């Protein structure tokens, strides 16, 4: 049995968008599930679209995601070079062989001649398919034009194909009328191969067993197969995958400002969570399990569970999954992950490890950290209506009573190095005051944070702030509440 070999063959045109990354992941999983090889090949034949530094982005992204390649431009292998522009002389030779085999021909037509045919088709209301007169030229006529230095492209020759079909692992048997296939360009006038032709040659040369790509290539595959057949080569196994959609009507697209992998990481999503989530875009495991490590995905991945239907990218689902990853981290890994964000957000003399602990159950993405902990450095001029809480049964009057009592208690409290002792101290207060826990703890939390939503409760926040700052903030609350409560009493 031949070894399973897949390839990820991106063009160096910028950032890695989610659809591309999902294709790379599927290719990686197909190969690794079968104990095979995953190759990286750079397809840079379209020199106009090439972006400086984009190859490094590809390397960096794949490494961050754990998609380590077995062969590629940087590490070599038995089938290199792995950059198409470094393989240029080879393609021309293969194209000339294909001409001899009757699968291709020289085309000397000008853009004007092609455009004239297009306009004629439009005027007749029929779909345009270029009917190339050059394929009827004799060998002598072709040679005379070549000797005269006429510019040319090499086109695929398609004739008398009739009904043709191929089998796809996802979409099953695909039948196509050969008469609708157009004679695509294989070698451009600048000598560069087109993406379509270079792909076929490279896949064969590199012994790629499974070609994984977007379902938009289903319609081109019969043309590829004619080339495989003309050379007498074995066709690869085709795995066409559905698109990743922004919504029911729009594909995810970097051009439309949709998030790339780099954008998501910059927003505070974890590479492992992103990979887990995109594995489930268009593929479903046999169980209800949703959280998978890459190694677990390798074990359970099955081509036949790839869906034919488009997958919709749901940022809320990714956010939820990212939160699960953050909460499942061991203490040390988690702290090292959030520390840069905490150092940026908190500059006061506070224990960042303690802050990290209280935010772990409450954040889903790393970029939520700054906003959730900004009150440690600065107590804002908050709305006093926050002291009014129906569920907690608090009003400004109740809050003022609670804050005055808590200030007195905390001034006498001297075990600020123990969260448990502080917990015991503050939870004893409601009983003494014959109040409910929330009637005391909600006002304290409001006073020490100035926020309606905080990553921790009153006791946790007070413990991190320490005695002096906690008492200062409670006094601010007392002073401000005294003004409105007294005003109410006067009226």
Model-derived features: positions:
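N-terminal Rossmann-like or analogous alpha/beta NTP/dinucleotide-binding catalytic cores
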Residues: 1-123, 221-233
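Active-site cores that bind ATP or allylic diphosphates and position pyrophosphate for catalysis
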Residues: 97-100, 105-106, 110-240, 246-252, ...
């Amino acid at each position: 049995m031949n070894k399973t070999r897949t390839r990820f063959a991106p063009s160096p045109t910028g950032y890695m968008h989610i659809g591309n990354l999902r294709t790379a992941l599927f290719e990686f999983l197909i190969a690794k599930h079968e104990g095979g090889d995953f190759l990286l090949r750079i397809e840079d034949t379209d020199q106009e679209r090439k972006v400086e530094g984009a190859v490094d982005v590809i390397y960096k992204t794949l490494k961050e995601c754990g998609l380590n390649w077995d062969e590629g431009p940087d590490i070599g292998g038995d089938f290199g070079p792995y950059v198409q522009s470094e393989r240029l002389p080879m393609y021309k030779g293969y194209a000339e062989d294909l001409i001899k085999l009757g699968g291709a021909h020289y085309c000397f037509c000008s853009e004007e001649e092609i455009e004239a045919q297009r306009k004629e088709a439009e005027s007749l209301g029929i779909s345009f398919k270029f009917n190339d007169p050059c394929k009827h030229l004799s060998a002598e006529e072709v040679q005379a034009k070549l000797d005269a230095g006429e510019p040319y492209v090499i086109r695929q020759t398609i004739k008398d194909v009739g009904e043709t079909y191929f089998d796809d692992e996802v979409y099953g048997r695909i039948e196509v009328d050969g008469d609708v296939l157009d004679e695509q360009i294989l070698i451009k006038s600048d000598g560069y191969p087109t993406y379509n032709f270079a792909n076929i040659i490279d896949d064969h040369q590199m012994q790629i067993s499974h070609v994984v790509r977007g379902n938009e290539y289903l319609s081109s595959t019969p043309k590829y197969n004619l080339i495989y057949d003309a050379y007498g080569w074995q066709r690869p196994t085709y795995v066409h995958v559905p698109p990743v959609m922004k919504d029911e009507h729009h594909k995810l697209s970097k051009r439309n400002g949709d998030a790339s992998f780099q954008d998501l990481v910059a927003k505070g999503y974890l590479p492992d969570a992103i990979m887990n989530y995109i594995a489930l875009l268009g593929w479903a495991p046999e169980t209800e399990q949703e959280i998978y490590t890459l190694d677990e995905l390798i074990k359970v991945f099955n081509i036949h569970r790839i869906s034919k239907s488009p997958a919709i990218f749901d940022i809320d689902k990714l956010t939820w999954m990212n939160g699960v990853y953050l909460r499942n981290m061991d203490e040390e890994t988690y702290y090292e992950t959030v520390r840069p964000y905490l150092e940026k957000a908190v500059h006061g003399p506070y224990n960042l490890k303690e802050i990290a602990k209280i935010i772990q159950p409450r954040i889903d993405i790393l970029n939520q950290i700054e906003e959730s902990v900004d009150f440690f450095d600065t107590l804002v001029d908050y709305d006093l209506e926050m002291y009014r809480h129906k569920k907690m049964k608090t009003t400004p009057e109740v809050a003022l009573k609670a804050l005055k009592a808590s200030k007195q208690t905390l001034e006498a409290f001297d075990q600020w190095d123990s969260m448990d002792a502080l917990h015991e101290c503050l939870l004893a207060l409601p009983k003494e005051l014959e109040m409910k826990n929330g009637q005391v703890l909600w006002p304290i939390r409001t006073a020490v944070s100035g926020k309606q939503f905080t990553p921790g409760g009153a006791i946790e926040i007070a413990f991190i702030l320490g005695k002096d700052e906690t008492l200062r903030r409670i006094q601010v609350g007392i002073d401000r509440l005294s003004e409105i409560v007294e005003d109410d009493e006067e009226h």
